[in-house]
Each structure stands twice: as C-alpha cells, then as structure tokens.
Regions:
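Non-catalytic C-terminal accessory region of glycerolipid acyltransferases
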Residues: 10-143
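Membrane-interfacial amphipathic helices and adjacent loop/beta segments
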Residues: 1-10
C-alpha cells in the first residue's frame, strides 16, 4: 500500500512500525528535504558542494529499531537495473553525540547517492535548486 506522509505524527509512526513488524518495507525518498520545513535537515558535502538532506529517515529508523537499505535505479544499455543495498542494520543516535551521528549517517547516504549520480549523471532528477543555503525552520506567525 502507498502512504504519503508529509509529517510524522505518533499515529503515523505507529502505523509504520506495524508495517515493518509485519515484514513490509517503508520507502523514504532520501534526497529530498521535508515538505514542511521543520529544520530537521543536515548539510553535508555532495558532488563538491554543501547540500541539505533530511534527518528524518535516520531518526525514524532509530526510533523504530529497523535497518536501512538504499534503492537506486539506473537505465543501462536500455535496461533498468535496481541496486538494493544494505546501509545500516541499526541506527544508533547517542544523546551526547546525536548531531555528529546524524551528520555521519547523512554523509554516508550522500556519498552513496553521489556514486550513482556519477555513474549516470543525467538520471538524477530534482526540481528545485539543490545546492541552496541551509534550510531554516519555518517561522510560525506571531499572534
């Protein structure tokens, strides 16, 4: 089943946990920042520049105690090839070093994405200026 999530609420997290425990996969687009700008992004090096990536997949995997895999699809010689790879069995985010640990996971993902972008640079699509300034959380209007 397809579940589009724009915000992780406790109800959504419980639903995702049930899906994982029943053997289903949860796919998160790792090269996009959150729809609602909540500031949960991490700036890391990507293709020679700094770029913001979401922290959400790693925080969620840490809370749900589930592994992370990556999935890339490249068209090579007229045939689509899927690359499904183990990323981490467990995401550990220690309280004292949480920001550093998140940065390490996000950088590892950016490095892996970069590898596939270098293999097929015209097959990575984004529809906004990817290498912009760091993402700032949305400000709630004051009353």
């Amino acid at each position: 089943s397809l579940l589009q999530v724009t915000e992780i609420s406790p109800a959504v997290a419980i639903s995702l946990d049930h899906k994982i425990k029943s053997g289903e996969f949860v796919f998160i687009v790792g090269d996009r920042i959150p729809v609602r700008n909540n500031g949960r992004t991490q700036e890391v090096s990507f293709l020679g520049e700094n770029a913001s990536f979401s922290q959400g997949p790693y925080i969620l995997a840490s809370l749900l105690k589930c592994p992370i895999y990556t999935l890339f699809c490249l068209k090579e010689s007229g045939t689509y090839h899927l690359y499904f790879e183990h990323f981490s069995e467990k995401i550990h985010l220690p309280r004292k070093d949480r920001e550093h640990a998140l940065r390490e996971y996000v950088q590892r993902f950016a490095d892996r994405l970069q590898k596939y972008c270098m293999m097929a640079p015209l097959q990575w699509f984004n529809f906004y200026f990817f290498w912009s300034t760091p993402v700032e959380p949305e400000q709630k209007p004051s009353s």
